[in-house]
Amino acid sequence: MSSKRTSPNGKQRLLNFLRGLLEDDSHSDLITWSNKDTLEFQMLKPHKVAELWGAATGNPGMNYDKMSRGLRYFYTNNTLKKVKGKDSRYCFLDTPLLAPFPDFFPKANEPMRRVPLFSIENLLASSEETTSNFSLQSSPSSSSNSSSARTMSATSSPTSSLEDVINPPVLIDPFQMQMAHITQTFLATQLPALQAFPMQLQLQFLKTLLPTLFPNNN
């Protein structure tokens, strides 16, 4: 029967295991840094460290001789080296675990990244706000604030919004109101030159683009 070979990944776990022990003060009587600046450490009780490694991997027969053979794997790839002597000293040379982890989280004082001007999410969020404002404008108590509730305007005339020139009874459906505002926002952000044309021409363009918003027009 052939002996079970340890995979490179299993050996890499051994290296991580040792680093974990070094960072845990409760095991400082077993393994400790002899010079942390140079990443040199010493196993004060190497056989006990091997027993812990065996318990972690489900191998009760693990001993220091077997574990040290696993450590030799790292000598060949310049990841670990044995310090001369018989006091179980080793030195990390290059290990991914020792490399700093990238910071995926923005700092608190960093400015937030600007969202592109035109996006479906932005249009939907903006149209939901406008739909809510439209509902408030329909009540008698809020009629005096209707001029300030509209979010998009091309001119300062009373019919300055595409939503104003579309037959109001048709736009009782919130979905139609939302679609009208999305279209108006699209025109304002993607076709700003269209804002220079009279409102009736803008309305005609909208009728052609979205005829479902004008069910009463043939």
Swiss-Prot record:
Gene3D superfamilies: Winged helix-like DNA-binding domain superfamily/Winged helix DNA-binding domain (1.10.10.10)
Domain of life: Eukaryota
Main location class: nucleus
DNA-binding region (UniProt annotation): 12-93
Keyword set includes DNA-binding: yes
Family: Belongs to the ETS family.
Subcellular location: Nucleus
Keyword DNA-binding: yes
Organism: Caenorhabditis elegans
Descriptive protein name: ETS domain-containing protein ets-7
Pfam families, per database record: Ets (PF00178)
Keywords: DNA-binding, Nucleus, Transcription, Transcription regulation
Inducers of expression: Up-regulated by salicylamine.
Region described as Disordered: 131-162
SMART domains, per database record: ETS (SM00413)
Composition bias, Low complexity: 131-161
Coiled coil: none
Entry function: Probable transcription factor. Involved in responses to oxidative stress.
Lineage: Eukaryota, Metazoa, Ecdysozoa, Nematoda, Chromadorea
GO cellular component, one term: nucleus
Record-level GO BP terms: cell differentiation; regulation of transcription by RNA polymerase II; response to oxidative stress
